[in-house]
Amino acid sequence: MSLTLLPAVDVRDGKAVRLRQGESGSETDYGSPFEAARTWVEAGAEWIHLVDLDAAFGTGNNRDQLREIVHELGDRVNIELSGGVRDDASLDAALEAGAARVNIGTAALENPDWTASVIKKYGDRVAVGLDVRGHTLAARGWTREGGDLFETMKFLDSVGCLRYVVTDVAKDGMMSGPNIQLLSEVAERTDAKVTASGGISKLDDLRAIKELAEIGVDSAILGKSLYARAFTLQEALEVAK
């Protein structure tokens, strides 16, 4: 079974950045978000994971810039939009921009009724981001705790969630390897598909994630590993086949 790869473009103050462990202020600047996204498309990406960090942290938004990226590249690549989607206005803006899929995070923890309604309405166009420390969820830009992972999943499964994007916060941007145990625990507890995020640092990490395909881990987000040139996207796509 093949693994779908989603190169990440995280946007802060109009620039493409990478954070360490999701902490505001830890970013490394990688220049133009549009150029970053275009680079991954030209290298063969079928999906881009596009994140508005300002919206996630509540420090403004980069909505116009993200909309422009979707508009310019959306006919060549599927775009998953993430960051600060927690109400009808932000969800509608993301969907109207042309995103193939939208990740909701904090909202799923703070407003379960709303989350249930959008999962019912939009189905597989909505994924829920589960940002985890241990078995505890981290909320709003990872600065607050949001309850037990498996209790939250039980609720989300009951309302028909079809995809989880699972990030081990301690691993994100640290190039220290993915949390295979966490991914296995999540995938074994749900019929939903699982996207792995955080910690991927070498091609063997992708091989390890690919072995979880039969229990429902069908995709992986690549961030720091690509920007730090640990491997090329072409090499990763070859492994993911």
From Swiss-Prot:
SUPFAM superfamilies: Ribulose-phoshate binding barrel
EC number in record: 5.3.1.16
Predominant place of localization: cytoplasm
Superkingdom field: Bacteria
Matches recorded under Gene3D superfamilies: Aldolase class I
Biological process (GO), any one: L-tryptophan biosynthetic process
UniProt subcellular location: Cytoplasm
Pathway assigned to this chain's UniProt record: Amino-acid biosynthesis; L-histidine biosynthesis; L-histidine from 5-phospho-alpha-D-ribose 1-diphosphate: step 4/9
A Gene Ontology term for the protein's cellular component: cytoplasm
InterPro entries for this protein: Aldolase_TIM, His_biosynth, HisA/PriA_Actinobacteria, Isoase_HisA-like, Isoase_HisA-like_bact, RibuloseP-bd_barrel
Alphabetically ordered keywords of this record: Amino-acid biosynthesis, Cytoplasm, Histidine biosynthesis, Isomerase
Broad EC category: isomerase
Catalytic activity, as annotated: 1-(5-phospho-beta-D-ribosyl)-5-[(5-phospho-beta-D-ribosylamino)methylideneamino]imidazole-4-carboxamide = 5-[(5-phospho-1-deoxy-D-ribulos-1-ylimino)methylamino]-1-(5-phospho-beta-D-ribosyl)imidazole-4-carboxamide
Active-site residues per Swiss-Prot or TrEMBL entry: D10, D131
Molecular functions per Gene Ontology: 1-(5-phosphoribosyl)-5-[(5-phosphoribosylamino)methylideneamino]imidazole-4-carboxamide isomerase activity; phosphoribosylanthranilate isomerase activity
Family, per entry: Belongs to the HisA/HisF family.
HAMAP family documented for this protein: HisA
NCBIfam families: hisA-trpF
UniProt-recorded name of the protein: 1-(5-phosphoribosyl)-5-[(5-phosphoribosylamino)methylideneamino] imidazole-4-carboxamide isomerase
